[in-house]
């Protein structure tokens, strides 16, 4: 097969000019990295090739089945949810959580509180702030603090009885470092 990548996923390497959608050769050289290891880039929807012989045997897929580049997880989620135009924002709460908004041109936050990524819509970008610990904090609470084996639905029902604002309780979900509004792998709440 041919090795390649697409712009939304390549945005996370810090070696991509997100604005111009090409590898920053000068940055790559300054970092002392080999220039020939960076794959050709394509749009998410473009055909990367077809199913390899070995994969066809293992899966039963035809060798004529085309393989598409795809997208990074957040870009795919935004596209799948129809978040493809400026003015539309999405909130994703999974193990980690993100808030993302589509923009017409890249935005750069010098304090690195937000990140800019290439969107699957070729002439768009998205800005995103994410926390490493979203829904995963519920598992931590259940196991470490409550030591409770009841189903989450029971805990949800109980939590719904608490007043809005939880009587001033503030939880900072830094259980495994943090990404935004600041990057700190050692942050703890």
Feature map (PLM): residue ranges:
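Active-site core segments that coordinate phosphate-bearing ligands/cofactors
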Residues: 1-5, 9, 13-32, 53-189
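A conserved helix-loop-beta module that forms one wall/lid of the active-site cleft
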Residues: 32-43
């Amino acid at each position: 097969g041919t090795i390649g990548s697409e712009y939304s996923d390549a945005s996370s390497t810090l070696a991509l000019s997100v604005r111009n959608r090409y590898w920053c050769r000068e940055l790559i050289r300054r970092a002392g990295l080999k220039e020939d290891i960076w794959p050709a880039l394509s749009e998410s929807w473009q055909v990367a090739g077809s199913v390899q012989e070995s994969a066809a045997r293992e899966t039963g897929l035809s060798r004529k089945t085309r393989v598409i580049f795809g997208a990074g997880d957040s870009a795919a989620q935004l596209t799948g949810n129809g978040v493809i135009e400026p003015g539309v924002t999405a909130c994703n709460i999974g193990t980690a959580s993100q808030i993302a908004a589509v923009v017409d041109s890249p935005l750069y936050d010098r304090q690195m509180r937000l990140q800019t990524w290439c969107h699957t819509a070729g002439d768009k970008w998205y800005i995103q702030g994410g926390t490493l610990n979203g829904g995963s904090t519920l598992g931590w609470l259940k196991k470490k603090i409550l030591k409770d084996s009841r189903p989450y639905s029971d805990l949800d029902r109980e939590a719904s009885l608490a007043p809005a604002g939880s009587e001033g309780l503030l939880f900072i979900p830094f259980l495994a470092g943090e990404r935004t509004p600041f990057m700190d792998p050692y942050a703890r709440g």
